[in-house]
Every structure is written in C-alpha cells, then in structure tokens.
Swiss-Prot record:
The keyword Cytoplasm applies. Residues 290-304 are annotated as: RNA gate. Pfam families: eIF-3_zeta. It comes from Drosophila yakuba. GO terms for cellular component: eukaryotic 43S preinitiation complex; eukaryotic 48S preinitiation complex; eukaryotic translation initiation factor 3 complex. The gene is eIF3d2. This is Eukaryotic translation initiation factor 3 subunit D-2.
C-alpha cells in the first residue's frame, strides 16, 4: 500500500440555494463586454500595408472599441533607433487584368476554327490563319461593329475626331436660328404634287444597253471622258433669271435642294448661301466651293482620315468619286455623230462654241409648297432610253466606287457583286447613306423614270487612276426612296421650314451651315460682301473634270 500515492478528497462546496460556487473572492477584474457574433482576427498583423478600404471595421467589436486593454509604452528612449535594412515596397493600386495571360497569339482564346481553315475571332475580327473575306463569309458580319472598338472598353476611350467647318464663321456674322436634327425629323409636308415643267433645255444621248450585261466575268475598263460639265449656280443661270421675272418666289438647283432635304443624314459640314430680295429667295452655292464634290464613306463607322498626300484621304477620295461619276455617266451612252440624240425644246443654255458638252438635259420645274410659296428649280437628266412600249424614259446615271474593302471593313465587290448584290448595296447604304439619299431626291425632283447605279472599283487598291466597271443596277426613284427609308414628306417639310424662317427676315444675305461636329444646322445673317473675294474666277465652274482634277 505504501507504493501508491494517497488519495485526498477535494473540497466541494455545496450550494443549497442555487447553482455555482457559494463564495467568490473579489479580485477587481474588469469586465469586457463581448458578442459571440464577433469575428476572430489577429491581434496584430504586421504584413498588411494598408487597411481595407471597402470594409475598414471588418473585425471591430459590435459594442465599440475600448481602450482599456490598449498598451501604452511610458518609458521614452530617444536614443534607441530601429534600422530597417529591407527595402520597402511601394503600394500599387489594383490593376484590372494585371495577371491576365497574353492572348494576342492564343488562337484558343481568340476564337474557333471554321470551315475552310478560316479562323473566326472571338472578339469579332480575324486572327492569324484566317482572312477577312472568310471571316465575313462565315461570321456573316455579325461582329464588325465590335471589331471597330477592339482594345477599347465599350468605345469610351475612342478618340474624338473634330471635323473642319466648310466655311469660317466671321465675327460680324449674326446667328439667327439653330435647329437640331431631332426637330427636323418631326417635320412633314404631305401631298406635294409632281413638279410641272415650265422649260426644257439641252439634249440627251441614248443609253447603251450592253452595259447591263457587265458582270465580274465581263468587266469593262472605265475610260476618261473629256467632256465639259457645267456646274452653274442659281443666280448665274440665264433661264432662272428669265423665269424669276414672271413666276415663282423661291429659286434653286436640284443639288442645293437635295442637300437641304437630306441634311439629317449628313455628317460633313456644308453651306448654302441665301439671298432675299423682296418676296423672292435665291438659294445659291459659293464660288470655288467643294459643294459639287461627292463624299465617300461619309456615314460609315470609320470615315476616311484627312491625311495630306494620301490617295485615301477624304479630299482625294471625293475628287476620285466625282471623276468616276462623270466618266461613268458619259461612257455608258451611245456616243457618236451618227448616233441619235433626244433634243428638248430649247438648246443648252450653257453651250459654248467649240466645246464638247456632256450629255445633259435640263428641266426647269415648278412646285407649289403652299402658303404662297412657289418653288422653281433646275433639274437634270443624264441619258434617255426607249421603253418597251416605245415611250422615252429619262435616266439619272450615278456611280458607286470601291477603293479598299479591307480598310473600310465592307463587302468585297469582286466576290459578292454577282451572287449577293443586295449585301453590296446594303453595305453602301450604311457607308454612303447621305450620298445615295441625295441622288434619290435629285432623281425624284427631275422626274426621272430610272435611277441607274454603276459599280466601279479600282484595278488595284493602291492605284487610284485606273478603274473597272463591275456591274450596273437600276431602280425606280420612288421605289428606291422607300427601300432606303427616305421620307419625301419629311424632306419637303425641312425645306419649307427653312424657307419660312428666311421669309420672315429682312432683305439681305444669309447662310445655312451644317455644324461640323453637331447634328444641327445654323442660320446666319452675313454681310452683302461676305464672299465677293471668292468669285473672281467664275470660269472654273464650267471646266471639264478631266482638266480640273489631277488624274
């Protein structure tokens, strides 16, 4: 028994009146309130450089912070210094995509492989191993808009392109009215009847139907036609001067009217000069102006840049498109001394002796716009063709041009024109909506029976001097206006609105200008001698395009 330790019974207090010990010694121990829901954290964390900004009180007690357990070092030893030999790492803010892998050349991350070994980009664009044509073919152009904004977060970082104004606004010009496009789109002037011919001048050559058979397998080169085209403004037209003495109170040309009536589709800046003399209003264009140049890809997502010296700059493409349109409209006609011509009642008012004039027929037409507003405008035809019933059908001949489908991210004509002509036309409607609308309005105003469109492309994308005709297509102007969603009632309403504003002004000179960077038009009161210095050489308006354009 001596080998075992003795068992000592512990002292157990017995509480007859409740639970727990009977007596507790007072030790002056303070009580810290706590909550069982508090998170348990570290007492001190020397590895965190900065506290959390989003949840600064993540480990704070529900009952508040108490300083009774805080440690205070009372002895101040100023002679002791702690030297930290490790380099401190500067705090860097969080960067989005910092640890994202490089997917520039990762085909699996960019897209998948389609038929014909064409790689389709997951972000809407072609990658290594695939071509633009195949991507458009199998992707059906679904992500072409997103492909324009690759590398930008929803286009927020897209650079803002500031366009130049067509005319410099002077300090002595007085702003009269500013009308934004949403207001213009609400206007309507219905029930405008067909224009009535009051004078017809010039002569027309017959259309060569062989060009209707032109296709991708039977393309024809575009020839240079050295024939004079007159671009005379309203006040310089001798026929309008004669008619203004006896009839009408608003006078213009079809180009000026089409520009105003289709202003809601324009992006580039343009201007029209207005002269008010009593109850008569003349809509003019400035001398030596680029008003007659055709725009290229004006309404596309990526319009041409203004690069000086480049063949693909906005100005160079406009000159090229104007030259193509002139040459095409004359080449598709049956030209020759032995060929018949359709002659109007009066000769060409701009005829000059010894000058080969282009085939052009002028029709001076009259419209009643209501409220004693009578419009007289000079309209034109480019050719004539004999219909199936033997009747004469007047033509408005225009040309669309392709310069580089890869740059414009559009449909390639040499692959789609014969099989999917609708896709080609839809692409042109998206990129040149304003130009096509103007051509349609001009054809409707002139009363043309057909609007003939030609498809002209460069022989080589890097050569802007040689072109080929790939095909032609014809429409009825009224039906084509419906297809492109052109509301003629709204177009007449826009014109009538501006005429009413000018009619309320005193006699003088005014200017309508499309704002270069905003969707609005502005009306200014300008001095009488505002553009007198621009009209020194009036002969430039009647030069042939072959001499005025460097080709």
């Amino acid at each position: 028994m001596s080998n075992y330790a003795p068992f000592i019974k512990p002292y157990v207090e017995y509480n007859e009146h409740g639970w727990g010990p009977c007596e507790v010694p007072e030790l002056d121990v303070p009580y810290q309130p706590f909550c069982k829901g508090d998170r348990l954290g570290k007492i001190c964390d020397w590895t965190v450089s900065l506290p959390e900004k989003k949840f600064p009180s993540k480990y704070a007690s529900t009952f508040g912070n108490s300083s009774q357990y805080a440690y205070f070092y009372e002895d101040d030893d100023s002679t002791f210094h702690l030297v930290d030999t490790t380099g401190s790492k500067a705090f860097k803010p969080y960067q989005r995509g910092r640890y994202r892998p490089n997917v520039r050349n990762n085909v699996r991350a960019r897209g998948r492989t389609g038929r014909g070994n064409a790689t389709l980009g997951g972000l809407g664009g072609p990658v290594a191993g695939g071509s633009t044509a195949n991507s458009t073919k199998y992707g059906k152009g679904r992500n072409t808009r997103n492909a324009q904004n690759m590398g930008r977060r929803f286009g927020r970082n897209a650079p803002t392109r500031l366009r130049e104004s067509s005319v410099m606004v002077q300090s002595d010009w007085v702003s009269i009215e500013e009308i934004d496009f949403p207001r213009l789109l609400k206007l309507a002037l219905p029930n405008i009847k067909e224009g009535k011919d009051i004078a017809t001048c010039g002569s027309l050559e017959y259309y060569d139907k062989l060009y209707d058979r032109v296709n991708l397998r039977n393309e024809k080169p575009l020839l240079k036609m050295d024939r004079v085209v007159h671009t005379v403004t309203t006040t310089d037209d001798p026929v309008i001067r004669r008619l203004s003495k006896t009839m009408g109170n608003v006078f213009a040309t079809d180009e000026i009217l089409a520009t105003i009536m289709c202003c809601t589709r324009s992006n580039y800046s343009w201007d029209v000069v207005i002269e008010k003399l009593g109850t008569k209003v003349f809509l003019d264009k400035r001398d030596n102006d680029q008003f007659d140049l055709l725009t290229v890809n004006e309404t596309s997502l990526e319009p041409p840049m203004d690069e000086e010296g480049s063949i693909n700059s906005a100005h160079s493409l406009a000159m090229e498109a104007t030259l193509i349109n002139h040459n095409f409209s004359q080449q598709v006609l049956r030209i020759g001394d032995q060929e018949p011509r359709f002659k109007f009642e009066e000769p060409n008012p701009f005829e000059e002796q010894g000058v080969d004039l282009a085939s052009m027929g002028y029709r001076y037409r009259q419209w009643d716009l209501g409220n004693e507003v009578v419009l007289i405008a000079r309209c034109k035809h480019n050719g004539v063709v004999q219909g199936p019933n033997g009747d004469m059908q007047f033509l408005s001949i225009k040309a669309l041009n392709e310069w580089d489908s890869k740059v414009t991210n559009s449909v390639e004509w040499r692959q789609k024109l014969d099989t999917q002509r609708g896709a080609v036309l839809a692409s042109e409607l998206r990129n040149n909506a304003c130009k096509l609308a103007r051509w349609t309005v001009e054809a409707v105003l002139a009363g043309s029976d057909q609007l003939k469109l030609g498809y002209v492309s460069r022989v080589n994308p890097r050569d802007h001097l040689r072109h080929v005709i790939l095909g032609t297509q014809q429409f009825k102007p009224q039906e084509f206006a419906t297809q492109i969603n052109l509301n003629m009632d709204n177009a007449w309403g826009v014109l009538r609105c501006l005429i009413d504003i000018v009619m309320k002004q005193p006699d003088g000179k005014y200017l309508i200008m499309k704002d270069p960077n905003k969707s609005m038009i502005r009306l200014y009161d300008i001095p009488e001698n505002a553009f007198d210095s621009d009209g020194d050489d009036e002969s430039e308006s009647s030069e042939p395009f072959g001499n005025s354009i460097d080709n």
